[in-house]
C-alpha cells in the first residue's frame, strides 16, 4: 500500500447520538494510533472565529520589535513561560538550532498556587507582552483559546480511552490538574536554496507528552515520517482542522502499541508560517503505567511507571541542551579560527 498523509476524521460523532458513527470514529482513531499516531480532526467544537482571533493575536505579537519581545524572554524564569528567541531549541541532531520563534502560554498559575510554590512542570504566571496592540484583548483571546483546546484535548483522550476498550472517563485522573503548554509559533521564510539538511523550522522529533493538537495557518511545511517506506509526507493544512498526534508519554503508556511518530517542519514556501500547537502533558504527579489491553497476558510491560513531571522535564532538558552545546561548539570554532588567523598574520609580518 502506498503511504498516505494522516487521515482527516470527522470528530462530530463523539458529540452525537449515532452509536454506529461513534464506533466508526473510534476505530479510525485506533487505526491511526497503531499506524503512526497522526490524524486530523474536523467537526470539533472550537469556533472558527476563535481560531481566527488567536492566529491574528499571534501575528500581532511576532510583529513587535525584538527588544520588546525579549522583555518577556522565557529564560528569565524557571517555569517555561514567555518568549523564545529564534535558534533556541534543537530537536534533531546534526542540524542547526531551529528557525522558529515562539510565545509559551499556559494556565495562569499565581505565586500562591502549590504548583508554583513547589516548582512543578511548566507552572507559573504567564509573561504577557506589555506593548502588543490591544494588549487586554490579546490576553483574553489567548486564554479563551487555551481553555477551549484544553477541553478538546479531554475529548480526544476520551476517544483514545474508547480505542482501548475502557470507559471514556479513564483518563480523568490524568486531565484533572493537568499541565499543558500552548505555543504561538512563527517560522520566517527560508530561502529556497538554503541547505535544508541543516536548517529546519523544527527538526525531526517526536513530542514529549501525551497528545498534541496543532492549529496551522494556510502555509504548509509540516511533514510526518512514514516509517515503513521512509518517505516524508506533507500534512496539508485543512481550514479549521486540528492535527492530532500522540506523544512519547502516550506511546510509553500504550507499551508501544500506539505510536509517537517523527515529524518536522521545513518552511520552503517563501512565506512566513504561523502555527499554534497545544501540548497536553497531564497532571505532573500522575503516575503513567501500562494502559489496559496494551500488554499480552503473561508479558511484562516494556517500561516502568514514571510520573508526567519526570518524563516531560527530562525531554525538555535534552532538546534545549543540544542547542546550547551546538552554539558553544560554533563559538569555540570561531575563536580557534581567529587565533589561527592572528598567528598567520603574525608569521607574515
Curated annotation (Swiss-Prot):
Its EC number is 1.14.11.-. Keywords: Dioxygenase, Iron, Metal-binding, Oxidoreductase. Residues 178-282 form the Fe2OG dioxygenase domain. One of its GO terms (molecular function) is 2-oxoglutarate-dependent dioxygenase activity. Its cofactor is Fe(2+). Pfam families: 2OG-FeII_Oxy, DIOX_N. Belongs to the iron/ascorbate-dependent oxidoreductase family. PROSITE patterns: FE2OG_OXY. 2-oxoglutarate binds at residue 273. This is 2-oxoglutarate-Fe(II) type oxidoreductase hxnY. SUPFAM superfamilies: Clavaminate synthase-like. One of its GO terms (biological process) is small molecule biosynthetic process. The keyword Oxidoreductase applies. 2-oxoglutarate-Fe(II) type oxidoreductase, part of the hnx cluster involved in the purine degradation. The nicotinate hydroxylase hnxS accepts nicotinate as a substrate and catalyzes the first step of nicotinate catabolism. The major facilitator-type transporters hxnP and hxnZ are probably involved in the uptake of nicotinate-derived metabolites, and the oxidoreductases hxnT and hxnY in the further metabolism of 6-OH nicotinic acid. Fe cation binds at residues 205, 207, 263. PANTHER family: 2-OXOGLUTARATE (2OG) AND FE(II)-DEPENDENT OXYGENASE SUPERFAMILY PROTEIN-RELATED. It comes from the Eukaryota. Binds 1 Fe(2+) ion per subunit. The lineage of its organism: Eukaryota, Fungi, Dikarya, Ascomycota, Pezizomycotina. Induction: Expression is induced by nicotinate and 6-OH nicotinate, subject to nitrogen metabolite repression mediated by the GATA factor areA, and strictly regulated by the cluster-specific transcription regulator hnxR.
